[in-house]
Amino acid sequence: MDPNCSCSTGSTCTCSSSCGCKDCKCTSCKKSCCSCCPVGCSKCAQGCVCKGASDKCTCCA
C-alpha cells in the first residue's frame, strides 16, 4: 500500500504503523495510520487512532 494511504474514498486500505496517511479517505482505516487527527478533521476522522497533537499533524493541513 502507498505509504501515504491515498486510496479512493470509501475503499478499504491496509495502513501500516509507518503510514503517514496524508490522504486517508478509507472507511476501513482503523489502524494507527494517522499520527494525529482532530475529531473535526474531515480527511482523517475515519476511525484512525490519534497518537499526537493536531499541530503536529500533516494529513489535515
Curated annotation (Swiss-Prot):
InterPro entries: Metalthion_dom_sf, Metalthion_dom_sf_vert, Metalthion_vert, Metalthion_vert_metal_BS
Binding positions (a divalent metal cation 4): 33-34, 44, 48
Binding site for a divalent metal cation 3: 15, 19, 24, 29
MF-aspect GO terms: zinc ion binding
Keywords, alphabetical: Acetylation, Metal-binding, Metal-thiolate cluster
Metal-binding is among the record's keywords: yes
Binding residue positions for a divalent metal cation 1: 5, 7, 21, 24
Residues the record lists as binding a divalent metal cation 2: 7, 13, 15, 26
Gene3D superfamilies attached to this UniProt entry: Metallothionein Isoform II
One of the record's GO cellular component terms: nucleus
UniProt modified residues of type N-acetylmethionine: 1
GO biological process: cellular response to cadmium ion; cellular response to copper ion; cellular response to zinc ion; detoxification of copper ion; intracellular zinc ion homeostasis; negative regulation of growth
Keyword match Metal-binding: yes
Domain of life where this protein originates: Eukaryota
Family of this protein: Belongs to the metallothionein superfamily. Type 1 family.
Name recorded for this polypeptide: Metallothionein-1
Designated gene of the protein: MT1
